C-alpha cells in the first residue's frame, strides 16, 4: 500500500473569539512579514505587548519565528478578542502544515475556541441579569 503525504505550500485557517473573526494565511518566508488588515501587526495592535504576545503564542511555542510569513484579516470585536481569534487561527494553520504539532497545541488549549459570548438581555430586566430595584411596600 502506498502512503500519500500531502505537501502544502500555504495554509489558510480561521478562528473566532466573541464576535471577532480572523483568517490567517501562513506562507513560507522570512518571518519578518506579519500583516494584519494591510498593516504591520505591531501597528495594528498599537504596540501592545500583551496582544502581540498572546497572538504569537503558537509561533513561539514551536520556535518558527523566522520561517513563516503571516497574512491576517480580522473583523469584529475588540483588539483583545481579535488577538485571541488570531491565536486560534494560527494554531490551526500550524497543525495544517505539521500534523505532529497537534499534541503540542492541544495540551495548553490552543486548538479550542473559547465559547463564552455576551449573554442576551431578557425582558423585565435592565441588563442580562440585573433586575430593577425591588420594593416590598
Curated annotation (Swiss-Prot):
Biological process according to GO: translation
Single GO molecular function: RNA binding
One Pfam family here: Ribosomal_S9
Record carries keyword Acyltransferase: no
GO CC annotations on file: chloroplast; small ribosomal subunit
Keywords recorded for this protein, A-Z: Chloroplast, Plastid, Ribonucleoprotein, Ribosomal protein
Taxonomy, superkingdom: Eukaryota
Subcellular location: Plastid, Chloroplast
Keyword Chloroplast attached: yes
UniProt xrefs under Gene3D superfamilies: 3.30.230.10
Family annotation (InterPro entries): Ribosomal_Su5_D2-typ_SF, Ribosomal_uS9, Ribosomal_uS9_bac/plastid, Ribosomal_uS9_CS, Ribsml_uS5_D2-typ_fold_subgr
Main location per the UniProt record: plastid
Family of the protein in this entry: Belongs to the universal ribosomal protein uS9 family.
Protein name per Swiss-Prot or TrEMBL: Small ribosomal subunit protein uS9c
Name of the gene: rps9
Amino acid at each position: 500500500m502506498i502512503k500519500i503525504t500531502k505537501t502544502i505550500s500555504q495554509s489558510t485557517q480561521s478562528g473566532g473569539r466573541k464576535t471577532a473573526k480572523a483568517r490567517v494565511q501562513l506562507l513560507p518566508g522570512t518571518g519578518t512579514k506579519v500583516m494584519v488588515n494591510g498593516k504591520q501587526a505591531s501597528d495594528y495592535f498599537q504596540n501592545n505587548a500583551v496582544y502581540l504576545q498572546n497572538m504569537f503564542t503558537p509561533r513561539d511555542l514551536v520556535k518558527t519565528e523566522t520561517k513563516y510569513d503571516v497574512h491576517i484579516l480580522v473583523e469584529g470585536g475588540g483588539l483583545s478578542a481579535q488577538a485571541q481569534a488570531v491565536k486560534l487561527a494560527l494554531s490551526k494553520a500550524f497543525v495544517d502544515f505539521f500534523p505532529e504539532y497537534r499534541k503540542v497545541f492541544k495540551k495548553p488549549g490552543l486548538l479550542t475556541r473559547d465559547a463564552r459570548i455576551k449573554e442576551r438581555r431578557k425582558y423585565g430586566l435592565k441588563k442580562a441579569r440585573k433586575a430593577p430595584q425591588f420594593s416590598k411596600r
